[in-house]
């Protein structure tokens, strides 16, 4: 029985193809029960590799079934046939993904970026509070609903964090995600704290939101890793970013895992607080008292002529992305997209930039 017949018996009218790989595909469909369109990921067990079937797929199914958050793509139903096909019925994001938006419109204004990044951060806090880690956070996994709200998707690399007898989080060893979003400890192949890894990826995402470019050029991983470990972050002067925004990014892109921000510290950072038009940035502490953010303002070094990293804005001719993605092929929707998405220039573009760190001690965390 083909997919259309199987799904029709379950009340779904199959629509167009959204993505396809060697053993998985994603299609749109109309749900007769829900009375609206959905996305259905179809996985063929007969074609999938053993590692995916034994490790990644069971984790994804378990985690999707437990998640329920307004900024995470909703899973409506998961079922399997006797012919070895797994069907995952999900919310359909009608406005595409964040990277498509940035590719079309360019960098986001800080106010718009703040709203979207706050939605994403709340989704990550929800996951981390459940001891669930994503491990593949990137702009093309951030889908957009009809109102352009963030919907976190693709939990193919997600897992439940294990704890030892003393309650300490077990380290992960699997290289997950895309090199451009990967933390230095992951790129080095050493055991890593998965929640802390997610934070680094959040830093890359916020940089892309407000700069319209990648913070690091991943065409040379060895060179990129050296720059990351030196804690160098360049910001385009042309974007006129606020000090608070640059400071938050700088602290998320902290190579020292013991000093990188936690998700609660991100949410309490002064840049994340609602800004009254024309008034200075104010952070609200847990007691409800307003105070200046404890993060020092990011101050650019004068005369910097550093080059920017990979440019994402639709201003120049795109160049091919050389670095392949490491995601299992079972995630068909995102599988073939990385070369397209990073088909923006993957060599550094010449533009005036500012380079961190802040001139004041940078490691003070927001309280």
Curated annotation (Swiss-Prot):
GO biological process: one example: spermatid development
Subunit structure, as described in the record: Interacts with TSSK2. Interacts with HSP90; this interaction stabilizes TSSK1.
Protein family membership: Belongs to the protein kinase superfamily. CAMK Ser/Thr protein kinase family.
Location(s), subcellular: Cytoplasm; Cytoplasmic vesicle, Secretory vesicle, Acrosome; Cell projection, Cilium, Flagellum
Residue span of region Disordered: 276-367
Regulation: Kinase activity is specifically inhibited by 2 classes of compounds: biphenyl compounds (1,1'-(biphenyl-4,4'-diyl)bis(2,2-dihydroxyethanone)) and 1,2,7-trialky-1H-imidazo[4,5-g]quinoxalin-6-one. Activated by phosphorylation on Thr-174 and potentially by autophosphorylation.
Function: Testis-specific serine/threonine-protein kinase required during spermatid development. Phosphorylates 'Ser-288' of TSKS. Involved in the late stages of spermatogenesis, during the reconstruction of the cytoplasm. During spermatogenesis, required for the transformation of a ring-shaped structure around the base of the flagellum originating from the chromatoid body.
Binding-site residues for ATP, renumbered to this chain: 18-26, 41
Additional facts recorded: TSSK1B might be used as a target for male contraception or and intra-vaginal spermicides.
Biased composition (Basic and acidic residues): 303-314
Protein name: Testis-specific serine/threonine-protein kinase 1
Catalytic activity: L-seryl-[protein] + ATP = O-phospho-L-seryl-[protein] + ADP + H(+); L-threonyl-[protein] + ATP = O-phospho-L-threonyl-[protein] + ADP + H(+)
Active site per the UniProt annotation: 136 (proton acceptor)
Cofactors required: Mg(2+)
Organism phylogeny: Eukaryota, Metazoa, Chordata, Craniata, Vertebrata
Domain of life: Eukaryota
UniProt xrefs under CDD domains: STKc_TSSK1_2-like
Domain (Protein kinase): residue spans on this chain: 12-272
Keywords, sorted A to Z: ATP-binding, Cell projection, Cilium, Cytoplasm, Cytoplasmic vesicle, Developmental protein, Differentiation, Flagellum, Kinase, Magnesium, Metal-binding, Nucleotide-binding, Phosphoprotein, Serine/threonine-protein kinase, Spermatogenesis, Transferase, Ubl conjugation
Tissue: Testis-specific. Present in sperm (at protein level).
CC terms in the record's Gene Ontology section: acrosomal vesicle; motile cilium
Naturally occurring in which organism (per UniProt): Homo sapiens (Human)
Chain positions found as Phosphothreonine: 174
Principal location listed in the UniProt entry: cytoplasm
Modified how: Autophosphorylated.
One example GO MF annotation: protein serine kinase activity
Enzyme Commission numbers on file: 2.7.11.1
